[in-house]
Amino acid sequence: IKGGMGARPNKDGINAVAAGISNTMNTPIEILELSFPVRIDYYEITPDSGGRGRYRGGCGSRRAWTIVDHNARAAVCLERTKSPPFGVCGGEAGARASIALKLADGSIRPLLTKGGFNAPAGSQILLEVPGAGGYGDASERDSQACARDLQDGYVSAEPD
């Protein structure tokens, strides 16, 4: 599952991209579901996760797994959960990472961002990886770029 790449002085950041040094891989959903008793409920770009700016920071992604038919033990190591990915030259910060466990009764329990946890059968793991910071003042963003962001689902509303 991938996070956003920061905006550059002349271009938006890249959405949901692998960082070469992050020791992560983007295992296809079909392989995960064939290899483990889990169901991937969604895997998508997280709207509004890229920092606003003249150039928008790349959006992060989010994924939900349902533990199908047994209790499971999982481990996580997330960064950017307390301090968001910063923007530069007046750009706004991207969204922070988070992880939570939705239990069968519908209650949601935030999880520690480093370490192991138990996930009972029928529970759902909710993971959001961070977006990235924007570059430059958001009031200088091209109006056509704002409209494309809305159309593409990278933002949920046009800026004020």
What are these language model-derived features?
Residues I1-P159:
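Glycine/proline-enriched, intrinsically flexible loops and inter-domain linkers
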